[in-house]
Amino acid sequence: MEKQKPFTLFVPPRLSSSQVSAVKPQTAGGDSNYFKTVNKCTEGDFGVPLTMSSLSKNRENIDTDPAFQKLSILPMLEQVANSGSCHYQEGVNDSDFENSEPMSRLYSKLYKEAEKIKKWKVSIESELKQKENKLQENRKIIEAQRKAIQELQFENEKVSLKLEEEIQENKDLIKENNATRHWCNLLKETCARSAEKTSKYEYEREETRQVYVDLNNNIEKMILAFEELRVQAENARLEMHFKLKEDHEKIQHLEEEYQKEVNNKENQVSLLLIQSTEKENKMKDLTFLLEESRDKANQLEEKTKLQDENLKELNEKKDHLTSELEDIKMSMQRSMSTQKTLEEDLQIATKTIYQLTEEKEAQMEELNKAKTTHSLVVTELKATTCTLEELLRTEQQRLENNEDQLKLITMELQKKSSELEEMTKFKNNKEVELEELKTILAEDQKLLDEKKQVEKLAEELQGKEQELTFLLQTREKEIHDLEVQVTVTKTSEEHYLKQVEEMKTELEKEKLKNIELTANSDMLLLENKKLVQEASDMVLELKKHQEDIINCKKQEERMLKQIETLEEKEMNLRDELESVRKEFIQQGDEVKCKLDKSEENARSIEYEVLKKEKQMKILENKCNNLKKQIENKSKNIEELHQENKALKKKSSAENKQLNAYEIKVNKLELELASTKQKFEEMINNYQKEIEIKKISEEKLLGEVEKAKATVDEAVKLQKEIDLRCQHKIAEMVALMEKHKHQYDKIVEERDSELGLYKNREQEQSSAKVALETELSNIRNELVSLKKQLEVEKEEKEKLKMEQENTAILTDKKDKKIQASLLESPEATSWKFDSKTTPSQNISRLSSSMDSGKSKDNRDSLRASAKSILSTTVTKEYTVKTPTKKSIYQRENKYLPTGGSNKKRKTVFEFDVNSDSSETTDLLSLVSEEDISNRIYNNNTPDSHLLVKTPKQTPLSLSTPASFTKFGSLKKMREDRWATIAKIDRKRRLKEAEKLFT
């Protein structure tokens, strides 16, 4: 794109109604300087809120303007008319009557133009008042928005206080839940009797599975929707890119067309200049012909004098001959006698006479013809001299008018230079005020900044459009004035044509600017549409998140209902416990161990449930924040829509005005053609009048020489005025370039804001991805918890079966087996698990024997030992604690599988028959190789019996190592997602830069 040429803005001043009497047509220099001063007024006022002081200053400048103080030009015109009439007072009175008619027309036109100027002044004052009202309304709106922002901040503080209170309430609820869980642990003592209710848990498990399947399906749908949105965004970006290219090509095409038009206009101007030079050459030729015709006329007069003398001589000869003829006749009468002798002489004489008479008649005819030709030549010469005299008179009048106008222009230039200095000072003050306002506006919040920037754009567009309308009006007036002046002065035609071309080029530039402004408004509309689409997408995503949250809440409500039912069951079971306590006193020590382990399981499950509840609350808070942000954005988008609609309406109205102005320009061109025709008719009339004005030829020749001297002086003055005008134009161009730099800065700020918006959108997308990863982790944890529940249920069923088997075995066994058990207690080595050592089992049995148990307990132990000895090797029984193999497998879910047994790993080994609940008896860390050697005695595990004690519940422990590894995995995933989000941001920023470059 080539840089646009600097141009000057012409804006008409505001008139006071009391000063207008008539409008005087001015020269090009005066008009241009006048409108430049007014242009500075408008540039100083642009972009700053108008006040009454500025209006008063403008009005004082208008009142002191010399252009309007000297509008009453009627006496001047009368003087010109009187001076013109004194040159041809000796002529006919009809010419005075014909000159009075165009003067009356001129007066009527001048009064019409004065009325138009009054109307224009009233409309400008009303527009200024409207602008002041709009500025006051905008200030009120800004203050209201500030108050609303303060209220929102107070509300946010209140909400934060409420959140803290709710957090404290949640802590209290957690304490209450811990207390209730202690009661729930008592229920686990009677889990054997509550086996019938496991079917309900299985049914609920299936429901939860279905819920999780639905959640997975929803997540997959979300992923597909996000991919579709990404594809749509890329398609929209490509469409925008293509549209921008098309608009760029159109603009280039329009520039080429306008350049062609400019070249055509320049060619026309050159042709007009050539025509004017040709006319001047014709004038010179005519003057030369006049002088030649005068010389010829003098020569012809001398010839006519000579011919008159010849005619007189011939007439005398003729008279002499006639007298001789009479004498001869008398002599013939006297001398009849001598007739015969003289007949021959007479015949000869008659012949000679006839010949002489014929020759004389031919000479007379030739003389008559020469007289007629000379008379025609004389009449033609008289006509040409008359036309030339009239032309000289008109030129003298024009020269006098030009001298008067030059004097007026010099006075106006001096006054306007002083006004220009005042306007520059005023403009500087306004620029300082603008900077102060900008610093104040920068302190507002980001949302207000965005809104104000859009409003500034709208105001700038309005201001530019108003300037364009003012410029169009002023240029139409200038074109009209120039057209009138073309009819008055042929010598200034070149200057006026140049000004007309400059005005047309400036109009074309302003049209291009209008097109660019419309393109910018279209771009803003497209960006607003994109924002609306993104907001709608965000709303849909929020709805989906809300549905997920509602489902989670429903699940929580179900769990709470289950807890309530369990509490009711607790109350019922307490009554039963009092009756059953007597029976279970013997088995109390064993049950305590089971209860401790089950409590630990329950606590771990509760801890995980609390974590999930906290995560759900965090997600709810995030969703609420997103909702608020989307509501704010939707409000901003609606406001932008309304502003864009208003801008569209204004642009359409201004386009209509431009079309109307173009129609007016066409009409003015037609009027120019008609005025040219009238001018030609006037020339013909003047040529007729020249025939009457032969007397003033000699006077005009002297006056022409004086006029030439005055013309030379006027040309010098015009050159000086042009130089001054060029200096002032350069100053105006510098001011316009300053404004252009300011506009470029504003555009850069808009681009940076667009980048910030895009960064925000990318951050939101990365936050969404992080939330999805957290959801997937929570689901995995829930799946692991479900598996633990299933394992516990299976172990409960096994305990039931073992209880039934023990009851049957006690009835069948004899007292002999009991005696054998008493004799050899140490010989029987029980193996409670495939991974418990014999030494441990012996120590546990000895401790149980020495602890002062009741006889029933001993009998049951002996019976169980007898049954083990009598039964085959294939019988298996459940143990109180979970096997080391199962614990090892659970840990291996979170750890990578090793290839060899030589790697040393720590495994938990449980004390089965511990009577006390001390920490030393519960856990002991043992290496994997030592355990395998102790359990199998360096043999295969197939050679050993798998013995399980009755009424044992499994314990699901999650080691601290597994928790730390799970946390490290989470961090790794978050880091990966962060790097992916950064890469996406960089890629989108590059694409945005490509779009805007």
From Swiss-Prot:
Region (Disordered): 828-863
Residues modified as Phosphothreonine: 940
Motif Mediates head to head self-assembly of N-terminal ends location, chain numbering: 102-112
Tissue: Testis.
Subcellular location: Nucleus; Chromosome; Chromosome, Centromere
Region (Interaction with SYCE3): 207-363
Region described as DNA-binding: spans on this chain: 805-997
Modified residues (Phosphoserine): 824
Segments of skewed composition (Basic and acidic residues): 852-861
Record-linked InterPro entries: SYCP1
Chain location of the short sequence motif Nuclear localization signal per the record: 118-121, 701-704, 902-905
Coiled coil spans: 121-176, 212-696, 768-806
Biased composition, class Polar residues, residue ranges: 835-851
Coarse class of the protein's main subcellular location: nucleus
Listed GO biological process terms: cell division; chiasma assembly; homologous chromosome pairing at meiosis; lateral element assembly; meiotic DNA repair synthesis; protein homotetramerization; reciprocal meiotic recombination; regulation of protein localization
GO molecular function: double-stranded DNA binding
One Gene Ontology cellular component annotation held by this UniProt entry: chromosome, centromeric region
Entries under Pfam families matching the protein: SCP-1
Domain observations: The molecule is in a coiled coil structure that is formed by 4 polypeptide chains. The N-terminal region exhibits a prominent seven-residues periodicity.
Family matches, as PANTHER family: SYNAPTONEMAL COMPLEX PROTEIN 1
Subunit structure comment from the entry: Structural component of synaptonemal complexes. Homotetramer that consists of an N-terminal four-helical bundle that bifurcates into two elongated C-terminal dimeric coiled coils. This tetrameric building block potentially self-assembles into a supramolecular zipper-like lattice to mediate meiotic chromosome synapsis. Self-assembly is likely initiated by local proton density at chromosome axis, which is predicted to trigger antiparallel back to back assembly of adjacent C-terminal ends into tetrameric structures that anchor to chromosomal DNA.
Role noted for this protein: Major component of the transverse filaments of synaptonemal complexes, formed between homologous chromosomes during meiotic prophase. Required for normal assembly of the central element of the synaptonemal complexes. Required for normal centromere pairing during meiosis. Required for normal meiotic chromosome synapsis during oocyte and spermatocyte development and for normal male and female fertility.
Protein name: Synaptonemal complex protein 1
Lineage: Eukaryota, Metazoa, Chordata, Craniata, Vertebrata
